[in-house]
């Protein structure tokens, strides 16, 4: 059974039930037949654990019949007993919205996690996390490029203002670093409000992100919502909706362009799979939940642009065992406007961001959106890199000397292009000691055209590595020549 809750819900008449069964995070609760809570309603149960009283929150997932509902706990169920009293709040989980959320760290239930001692948090309005996607006639039809200042992204996989962007990659190839870099760049170059959803985030990563944002002075324009890796699956499944609800308020009520960062969509799918198994549903392909496409669509369809206002979403997506045919990443592909695939092979060369220029895609890599000059340059660079890839087998067997003169030139320029696609990032400065760089799109196009034309054939390959524009390359080349 499903139900959709619209707009801000008022608490209805509260029903009271009793716990009938507890199996891990799954709790069966018996209510009077005439006051059963609706699907997605939040239930509360008071319990005492080690002498400390606390309120446990649950969300109704199924109606079993005869007044019995099955709920998923959003907190550990230690200390929960049969017969304990449960109260129906009359509405879904709600989270605080508005300017008061900026600079704060929340959990899935909208509770603040970073209050100083003696500090209080008051908010005028709370919204339910289950909401309808905007109607078709409210959507924005205009398409505009979102400039990041990162060469490989702006040139070959341009992002869409108000679009959905996926950062795909296996473990350890730089998804979270790229997400953190985009947060830093948005705050530095674009201003505006950001919302970050840590779905199944490692505690260390979350802490690093908060510290970096505080040091950069950008946390005051960001709301952060975490459902950490060690929390029950119900929490991890709903944390993205909590963050999205906060972002929707900034878009719909305040009329702002919002950036929504989600790390990691795979763990959203994984949490849904755990909940589905706990509820006894028959698993689908590779053990995933049978309603995977529906669950993903419910989240993704709400991330969109309405007339004049947008939510631009950047989503890190873990690819299990680097297998892109796995149902979790494959289901996400259909919803995205741009895909940035991070390659372990490119990362092993020390080229960062480790974006694969040949497999990454964008809906707006088209002359009508980005202009003919940008499109021609991108296609030209892709052709050179593709030809270089085709020649690698010949080089591995026979060596470079066996290539034709034309192919030797292509390989030489492709190697320079590969290295010029690397770039220092602001968030990696603490490791490298080198300041990040932002390169305008016009400068990026000019630089790659000059390399493809052969104007920099005389410059050593290492001079192109981790540079911003061609000025940096020339400066580095001059330093290399001095040291020879």
UniProtKB/Swiss-Prot annotation:
This is ATP synthase subunit beta. The keyword Translocase applies. Pfam families: ATP-synt_ab, ATP-synt_ab_N, ATP-synt_VA_C. F-type ATPases have 2 components, CF(1) - the catalytic core - and CF(0) - the membrane proton channel. CF(1) has five subunits: alpha(3), beta(3), gamma(1), delta(1), epsilon(1). CF(0) has three main subunits: a(1), b(2) and c(9-12). The alpha and beta chains form an alternating ring which encloses part of the gamma chain. CF(1) is attached to CF(0) by a central stalk formed by the gamma and epsilon chains, while a peripheral stalk is formed by the delta and b chains. GO terms for cellular component: plasma membrane; proton-transporting ATP synthase complex. Produces ATP from ADP in the presence of a proton gradient across the membrane. The catalytic sites are hosted primarily by the beta subunits. The gene is atpD. It is an enzyme of class 7 (translocase). GO terms for molecular function: ATP binding; ATP hydrolysis activity; proton-transporting ATP synthase activity, rotational mechanism. It catalyses: ATP + H2O + 4 H(+)(in) = ADP + phosphate + 5 H(+)(out).
């Amino acid at each position: 059974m499903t139900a959709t809750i619209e707009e801000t819900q008022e608490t209805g008449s509260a029903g009271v039930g009793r716990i009938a069964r507890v199996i891990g995070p799954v709790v069966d609760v018996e209510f009077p037949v005439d006051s059963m809570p609706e699907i997605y309603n939040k239930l509360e149960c008071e319990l005492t654990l080690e002498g400390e009283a606390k309120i446990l929150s649950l969300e109704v997932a199924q109606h079993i019949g005869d007044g019995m509902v099955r709920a998923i706990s959003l907190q550990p169920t230690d200390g929960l007993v049969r017969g304990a009293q449960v109260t129906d709040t009359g509405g879904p989980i709600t989270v605080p919205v508005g300017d008061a959320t900026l600079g704060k760290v929340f959990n899935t239930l909208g509770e603040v996690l970073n209050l100083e001692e003696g500090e209080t948090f008051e908010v005028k309005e709370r919204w339910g996390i289950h909401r309808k996607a905007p109607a078709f006639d409210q959507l924005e039809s205009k398409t505009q490029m979102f400039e990041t200042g990162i060469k490989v992204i702006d040139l070959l996989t341009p992002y869409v203002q108000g679009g959905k962007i996926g950062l795909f990659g296996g473990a350890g190839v730089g998804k979270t670093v790229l997400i953190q870099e985009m947060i830093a760049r948005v705050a530095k170059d674009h201003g505006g409000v950001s919302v970050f959803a840590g779905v199944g985030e490692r505690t260390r990563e979350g802490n690093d992100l908060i510290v970096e944002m505080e040091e950069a002075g950008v946390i005051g324009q960001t709301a952060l919502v975490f459902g950490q890796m060690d929390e029950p699956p119900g929490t991890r499944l709903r944390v993205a909706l909590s963050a999205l609800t906060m972002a929707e308020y900034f878009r719909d009520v305040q009329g702002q362009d919002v950036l929504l960062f989600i790390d990691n969509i795979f763990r959203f799918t994984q949490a849904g799979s755990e909940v589905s198994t706990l509820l006894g549903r028959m698993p689908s392909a590779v053990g995933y939940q049978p309603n995977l496409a529906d669950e993903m669509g419910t989240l993704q369809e709400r991330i969109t642009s309405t007339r004049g206002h947008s939510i631009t979403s950047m989503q890190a997506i873990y690819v299990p065992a680097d297998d892109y045919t796995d149902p979790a990443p494959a289901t996400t592909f259909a919803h995205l406007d741009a895909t940035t695939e991070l390659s372990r092979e490119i990362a092993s060369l020390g080229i960062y961001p480790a974006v694969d220029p040949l497999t990454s895609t964008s809906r707006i890599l088209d002359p009508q959106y980005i202009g003919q000059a940008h499109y021609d340059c991108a296609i030209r660079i892709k052709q050179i890199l593709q030809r270089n890839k085709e020649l690698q087998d010949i080089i591995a067997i026979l060596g470079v000397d066996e290539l034709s003169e034309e192919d030797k030139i292509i390989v030489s320029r492709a190697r320079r292009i590969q290295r010029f696609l690397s770039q220092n990032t602001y968030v990696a400065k603490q490791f490298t000691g080198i300041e990040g760089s932002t390169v305008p799109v016009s400068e990026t196009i000019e630089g790659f055209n000059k390399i493809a034309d052969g104007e920099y054939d005389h410059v050593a390959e290492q001079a192109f590595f981790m540079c911003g524009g061609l000025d940096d390359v020339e400066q580095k080349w001059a330093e290399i020549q001095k040291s020879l």
